[in-house]
């Protein structure tokens, strides 16, 4: 049990959330461009 609490205590959740949101933003850009190309340019 000490291993689990120590593991979650040592994780920096702010850094994890920031990296998650940055990766979502980086992925969403090409996805929007790809969808626009498929639909012929009109949303």
UniProtKB/Swiss-Prot annotation:
Keyword Transmembrane helix: yes
Membrane topology of the entry: Single-pass membrane protein
Main location: membrane
GO cellular component terms, semicolon-separated: photosystem II; plasma membrane-derived thylakoid membrane
Record bears the keyword Lyase: no
Swiss-Prot/TrEMBL keywords: Membrane, Photosynthesis, Photosystem II, Thylakoid, Transmembrane, Transmembrane helix
InterPro entries attached to this UniProt entry: PSII_Ycf12_core-subunit
Transmembrane segments: 15-35
One Pfam family, short name: PSII_Ycf12
Any GO BP: photosynthesis
Compartments in which it is found: Cellular thylakoid membrane
Subunit composition and interactions: PSII is composed of 1 copy each of membrane proteins PsbA, PsbB, PsbC, PsbD, PsbE, PsbF, PsbH, PsbI, PsbJ, PsbK, PsbL, PsbM, PsbT, PsbX, PsbY, PsbZ, Psb30/Ycf12, peripheral proteins PsbO, CyanoQ (PsbQ), PsbU, PsbV and a large number of cofactors. It forms dimeric complexes.
Family, similarity comment: Belongs to the Psb30/Ycf12 family.
Record function comment: A core subunit of photosystem II (PSII), probably helps stabilize the reaction center.
Protein name per the record: Photosystem II reaction center protein Psb30
Gene, per the UniProt record: psb30
């Amino acid at each position: 049990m000490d291993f689990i609490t120590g593991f979650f205590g040592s994780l920096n959740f702010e850094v994890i959330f920031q990296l998650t949101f940055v990766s979502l933003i980086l992925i969403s850009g090409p996805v929007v461009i790809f969808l626009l190309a498929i639909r012929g340019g009109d949303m």
